[in-house]
């Protein structure tokens, strides 16, 4: 399958819940522009971990049985990989931090540096 171009944007899936701010409803973060070609040196299966098992088909991260929990992250589920938020944050931020530690070029790790578009 053809990879998306550099205009690809990662956004919260429909139905995603925002974390409340005290007794007020919260808001979802801004979307994340994803420059796919900058990640072309990474093996596809590093991010698309079911690629081989699915016969080369790229499925959405929120496919049933994968990262399909749309709850907001809190202390009780902070490590639950079923949460789509945790899946992206673990994959992206951990990789960027590892590259930074190895003094290699990398992407951002701060919220506002990734979540930049509406």
UniProtKB/Swiss-Prot annotation:
SUPFAM superfamilies: Multiheme cytochromes. Residues 1-28 are annotated as: Disordered. It comes from the Bacteria. Heme c 3 binds at residues 39, 92, 95-96. Heme c 2 binds at residues 49, 61, 66-67. It comes from Desulfomicrobium norvegicum (strain DSM 1741 / NCIMB 8310) (Desulfovibrio baculatus (strain Norway 4)). Its main location: periplasm. This is Cytochrome c3, 13 kDa. The lineage of its organism: Bacteria, Pseudomonadati, Thermodesulfobacteriota, Desulfovibrionia, Desulfovibrionales.
């Amino acid at each position: 399958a053809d990879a998306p171009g550099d205009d690809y944007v990662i956004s919260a899936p429909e139905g995603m819940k925002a974390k409340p701010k005290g007794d007020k409803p919260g808001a979802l973060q801004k979307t994340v522009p994803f420059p796919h070609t900058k990640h072309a040196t990474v093996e596809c299966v590093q991010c698309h971990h079911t690629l081989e098992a699915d016969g080369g088909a790229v499925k959405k991260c929120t496919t049933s049985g994968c990262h399909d929990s749309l709850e907001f992250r809190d202390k009780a589920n902070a490590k639950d990989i079923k949460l789509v938020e945790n899946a992206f944050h673990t994959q992206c931020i951990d990789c960027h931090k590892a590259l930074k530690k190895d003094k290699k070029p990398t992407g951002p790790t701060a919220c506002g540096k990734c979540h930049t578009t509406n």
